[in-house]
């Protein structure tokens, strides 16, 4: 077994326990984690880069950044001689070995500094707190109002047309929606150039996946938050074969299940075209396949934790088609652009050629995906708008 600790010193000790022969490489790695922890997302706003002493302090980290930026996880894990440690380092972000090593080290660095982690209540609770603050400041939210088209008048974005026929006029339009849908559907592909076409035709997306969620009347208190293990019997999902399982155990989050119960999830490889076509052409088989996969996952977990199968009270299976229907995300991807050496070295524009008063934010302009990318890129756009209006950007804490 191998435990990934958020504290770099504990992580180093664990890595040395597993692979003492990789001691030199391990100590270099954990030293870089500590160096990178000085460069947290809000570092620029603390003034660290403005002071000579602060800038000199992060020079070693900047040099290391270049090294990791051009290296993917597949290459990074080969630095370790121990086969098990090499395998484990390649699994921290699932099976996505094209992921840049820079993203791996930064994530561990922010966790070491306790500037990143899991929000209790999950993403919904996280975004609910943002919405609450937005409403306090006078904002409005329109639910069940999907945008069909972005209204363009005289070369500027002037509002949005909803799929229910409604129209909302605006001085500025900011899209946090799916990038492909925004550019090629909502704007009908009228505002793009060769660079944008190249990005959307060649950049790697996060893969489409299946998510199996389970609620069990079994207490997993004290168990690891996540475990990854090989399968004796592979699970076939469409044309994808899964020979390992990464199981997320939410016993640490008491909001996810009643007392004495636990919520668990796992992700499986899933082909978008297969599941989308199956849902359209044979809904009965689509539903049957979801039930079969859920049953096989439960059976697999039961072998790991005897009695689990009988304790499961609720299941939910989301296919790539589900992701696309609920989120509109292109090709059912569970996030946006994958953080690869290529995407990390490319500046993705947040504006479109020939269109004024329009901006894009989120995971299609900042590789890596997730809610933080929406907040970080959104904040930068608001700063730009404040500058255009001659207003100083300030943050008022509630």
Identify the residue ranges that each predicted region occupies.
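C-terminal segments that line or cap access tunnels to active or ligand-binding sites in enzymes
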Residues: 217-321
